[in-house]
Structures are given as structure tokens and as C-alpha cells.
From Swiss-Prot:
EC number(s) from the headed UniProt entry: 5.3.99.2
Official protein name in the record: Prostaglandin-H2 D-isomerase
Localization (cell): Rough endoplasmic reticulum; Nucleus membrane; Golgi apparatus; Cytoplasm, Perinuclear region
Biological process annotations from GO: mast cell degranulation; prostaglandin biosynthetic process
Reaction it catalyzes: prostaglandin H2 = prostaglandin D2
InterPro entries: Calycin, Lipocalin, Lipocalin_CS, Lipocln_cytosolic_FA-bd_dom
Function: Catalyzes the conversion of PGH2 to PGD2, a prostaglandin involved in smooth muscle contraction/relaxation and a potent inhibitor of platelet aggregation. Involved in a variety of CNS functions, such as sedation, NREM sleep and PGE2-induced allodynia, and may have an anti-apoptotic role in oligodendrocytes. Binds small non-substrate lipophilic molecules, including biliverdin, bilirubin, retinal, retinoic acid and thyroid hormone, and may act as a scavenger for harmful hydrophobic molecules and as a secretory retinoid and thyroid hormone transporter.
Gene name linked to the record: PTGDS
Lineage: Eukaryota, Metazoa, Chordata, Craniata, Vertebrata
Chief site of localization: endoplasmic reticulum
Swiss-Prot/TrEMBL domain comment: Forms a beta-barrel structure that accommodates hydrophobic ligands in its interior.
Alphabetical list of CDD domains matching this protein: lipocalin_L-PGDS
């Protein structure tokens, strides 16, 4: 149980990276002319979709978390997320290493010993970002996750609709798409 919760937190930190759904591995595009400097700053995890069974098991207990994106020295991004866990605020940082193109990154999971690809699929920099992560936790355990980030804790309805449509296009089912409820815990500047 704690292991699955830890994985979720590590992945949601970038809105990122379990029970499989039958769907082909999706090829997703990356935001054209991605501008990392405009992507920096505070984001809130507003929505998740995953083919992992832990999402179904944990979705009732999940809530929005705050993430801050900062530049890393290697040209990548540091994604620091603060979330509520066991009635305490916990903070974790993920290093997203630069990939083959701007907006494409990789994340090495210390928990699973695996590397996941993370793509900024679409963003307007001011309101929302759609991210898509994929990789493998082990033989036969392909992992896929989509994350909706919002600059506010109350994303507009059309952003939620856009996220749902994107997720369905990637083969996620309706019950694997979750919009995270707002919380006032762990959201203040630290």
C-alpha cells in the first residue's frame, strides 16, 4: 500500500509516471517550439489518468498537490512537489533530464529502478499543461500516465474537457481519468 502511494507521489511530481489496460503504446507529440523558461514556476496537479491499478485503489484518497518547476544545471528541469501524506506535508524533487527535443525529458525512478519518458504535450504556459509519461516498471508492466497541470487550483471546465479528450485518445478509459479535489493543506509557500 505505502509502495503504491510512494510511486504515485513520485510520478505526480511531474504529473508523472501499473494493472494494465489493453491499449497500444501511444506516440504523443511534444509542444511545438517548447519554451522551458515560460514553463517554470508554480503548477497544481489537477487531473491524472493512468493504466496502473494503484490509481483505482487510491483515487478516493488523492488530492491536488502543488509543484514548482525550476531550471536544472544540465538543461533539464527540477520538479518539486509538496503533497499531503499521512497528515503531514511532504516535499519531493524530481530531476527531469533533457530528452531528444525541447519538451521531452526522462526521469529515473529510484523506487522502480526504471526510466520513464516525460513529454510536455501541450501548454499555453499561463493556464495549463498536458504531460504524458510512459515506461516500464518491469517485464510486462508497461506504465502510462497523463497529467493535467493548472496554474490555479480551479482549472476551467474546457481544460478538463480537453484533458479528458486527450486521455481517451491515448486509450485511457473514463474510470481511469481522475480530477483531483482542491485542498488547502500543503498549498502555502514554504
Amino acid at each position: 500500500m505505502a509502495t503504491h502511494h510512494t510511486l504515485w507521489m513520485g510520478l505526480v511530481l511531474l504529473g508523472l509516471l501499473g494493472g494494465l489496460q489493453a491499449a497500444p503504446e501511444a506516440q504523443v507529440s511534444v509542444q511545438p517550439n517548447f519554451q522551458p523558461d515560460k514553463f517554470l514556476g508554480r503548477w497544481f496537479s489537477a487531473g491524472l489518468a493512468s493504466n496502473s491499478s494503484w490509481l483505482q485503489e487510491k483515487k478516493a484518497a488523492l488530492s491536488m498537490c502543488k509543484s514548482v518547476v525550476a531550471p536544472a544545471t544540465d538543461g533539464g528541469l527540477n520538479l518539486t512537489s509538496t503533497f499531503l501524506r499521512k497528515n503531514q506535508c511532504e516535499t519531493r524533487t524530481m530531476l527531469l533530464q533533457p530528452g531528444e527535443s525541447l519538451g521531452s525529458y526522462s526521469y529515473g525512478s529510484p523506487h522502480w529502478g526504471s526510466t520513464y519518458s516525460v513529454s510536455v504535450v501541450e501548454t499555453d504556459y499561463d493556464h495549463y499543461a498536458l504531460l504524458y509519461s510512459q515506461g516500464s516498471k518491469g517485464p510486462g508492466e508497461d506504465f502510462r500516465m497523463a497529467t493535467l497541470y493548472s496554474r490555479t487550483q480551479t482549472p476551467r471546465a474546457e481544460l478538463k474537457e480537453k484533458f479528458s479528450a486527450f486521455c481517451k485518445a491515448q486509450g485511457f478509459t473514463e474510470d481511469s481519468i481522475v480530477f483531483l479535489p482542491q485542498t488547502d493543506k500543503c498549498m502555502t509557500e514554504q
